[in-house]
Swiss-Prot record:
Domain (BTB) ranges: 26-96
Designated name of the protein: Putative BTB/POZ domain-containing protein L67
Family: Belongs to the mimivirus BTB/WD family.
PROSITE patterns named among the record's database cross-references: BTB
Family annotation (Pfam families): BTB (PF00651)
Length: 498
């Protein structure tokens, strides 16, 4: 049964459709009235009593229990008639059930004291948002209705039309967990698990999102570009010296980009530079070299430090050398790590409140995971293959070992393996791990760790788009502009009242 036809006909599972609004054995006339019209129905107490708490109460001890004629003022006559039809076993067509019907149906079910799922996944066009406001006002304001308003509020809506207490509540729900992914040199946006929307093309899978500006930076037509996700406006940026961009990171404290690229020209250099997203130009060079390759850029969680590696490859494999460097944005000091590595470092990441590091490399024909704590390196895991590494809560290491995800804890104990959960990993704010690259899957990492410890079944679900070969999936907030407008408006009201 569909969502509209699964509450009723409890009375011995009989179908009384032929008796709806019929003189046959009818023992009560009910007149439904709303603000627009009136409808009279010939009904049967036993059917209404068996299927509806509202009528059960009505027929138990009140005057209506003995009256032949009863008048009921209802929110919407047409929908209330539909609900009574369902009590008689009449299935309703799903055709032409727009969002207005769904919300009014929910309100009428609530009026009749019937359980009904709130229609949370409603999409309303911008021109209909005021109608949505009116309907929510009729239903009442609660967590679900306010969340629905926040989900559908147009970014450019005139927020001065709304009371400040409602805006304060809306502010809690304006963060929309949308995500962007790159596939086949195209960039897609997905809102609320909807169909992926093609935004633009790109020459590189290296893209970067600046959350405070709600801008997406990418390379196209041999130039750096940015898209304003509020308006989908694209602007090209001339950076004449920038060649191949290897990576881009966002400093959330300043909204600047940290770009690692190879320069154009006669003297090709590897560079790390700061790009000002306001002035749209490079403002500072952190490091440049024509002798080394720059790899493994990573930012600390507080965005105060940048770590990267310098590597030099020669024809002699025994002379390979890689060094870790750390740049402090506050002091503008660049420090060289005291140790040199004879193997290539992979997935360098900060850990332990940004004081230490974790990484892996290939050594003695095996891949080995190391932590660097207080400048001392510790080998904590060894396996035949590692393709990616992520760390969770500074305590658990998630390894893509080719055929499975291996979870190990920093005390060197192996927690377990999850087969076919491979690719690169991203950890969401609600403790889900998404793997992407080969396929796209999701699991609740906190629950998984508990289940592994207790030998319980592990549940893996698909996530978002079912496409294979997704690159650079990350979360964005396409309502960031609206959130800032509400915050600024509420601050201005507060200043005025004070």
């Amino acid at each position: 049964m569909n969502n509209y036809n699964n509450f009723f006909v409890k009375f011995n599972n009989q179908n009384f459709s032929d008796f709806y609004n019929s003189d046959t054995l009818s023992d009560i006339n009910i007149t439904l009235s709303d603000n627009l019209k009136t409808v009279s129905l010939k009904l049967h107490r036993i059917v209404l009593f068996a299927n509806c708490e509202f009528f059960k109460g009505m027929f138990s001890g009140f005057n209506e229990s003995i009256q032949k004629e009863n008048i009921i003022k209802v929110p919407n006559i047409d929908i209330c008639c539909d609900i009574i039809k369902q009590m008689y076993g009449i299935s309703l067509s799903e055709i032409n059930r727009d969002w207005k019907y769904m919300l009014r149906y929910y309100k009428c079910c609530d009026y009749f004291m019937l359980e009904s799922n709130f229609p949370e996944n409603i999409n309303v066009s911008r021109c209909e948002f005021d109608e949505l406001l009116d309907l929510v006002d009729e239903i009442g304001y609660n967590e679900k209705t306010i969340k629905l308003l926040a989900q559908n509020m147009p970014i450019n809506y005139n927020i001065t039309n709304l009371p400040s207490d409602l805006l304060s509540e809306l502010l809690n729900y304006t963060n929309v967990n949308s995500f962007i992914f790159v596939k086949d040199f195209s960039i897609y946006l997905v809102n609320n698990d909807d169909i992926p929307k093609h935004l633009t093309n790109t020459e590189s899978t290296v893209i970067c999102y600046v959350p405070n500006l709600n801008r997406l930076f990418f390379k196209a037509n041999n130039r750096l570009n940015f898209m304003d996700l509020d308006t989908e406006y694209i602007q090209q940026i001339n950076l004449n010296n920038v060649g191949i961009i290897n990576s881009m990171l966002c400093d959330h404290n300043t909204n600047n980009l940290i770009i690692n690229y190879k320069s154009r020209g006669e003297s090709i250099e590897s560079r790390i530079e700061i790009f000002d997203t306001d002035k749209l130009k490079i403002t500072k060079t952190i490091y440049k070299t024509n002798k080394y390759n720059i790899n493994n850029l990573c930012l600390s969680k507080d965005f105060s430090k940048l770590a990267f590696t310098l590597s030099k490859t020669t024809l002699n494999p025994y002379t390979y050398k890689e060094i870790i460097h750390i740049y402090n944005f506050l002091t503008e000091e660049l420090c060289e790590f005291p140790d040199e590595f004879n193997s290539k470092i992979h997935c360098l990441k900060f850990m332990n409140n940004d004081k230490d590091f974790i990484y892996y490399l290939k050594k003695d024909y095996h891949y080995q995971v190391f932590t660097c704590i207080n400048n001392t390196h510790h080998n904590i895991f060894r396996t035949e293959n590692i393709e990616y590494l992520e760390i969770y809560l500074d305590k658990y290491i998630l390894l893509n070992t080719g055929y499975s995800m291996t979870i190990i804890s920093l005390d060197k104990s192996c927690m377990g393996k999850i087969r076919d959960f491979v690719g690169e990993y991203i950890i969401t704010p609600n403790n889900h791990v998404i793997c992407y690259g080969y396929h796209t899957k999701s699991l609740d990492i906190s629950q998984i760790i508990n289940n592994l410890a207790e030998n319980k079944e592990i549940q893996i679900t698909s996530f978002g788009s079912p496409y294979y070969g997704i690159k650079n999936i990350f979360f964005v907030n396409d309502k960031n502009c609206l959130k800032r407008r509400i915050e600024d408006y509420l601050k201005s009201i507060l200043k005025t009242t004070n």
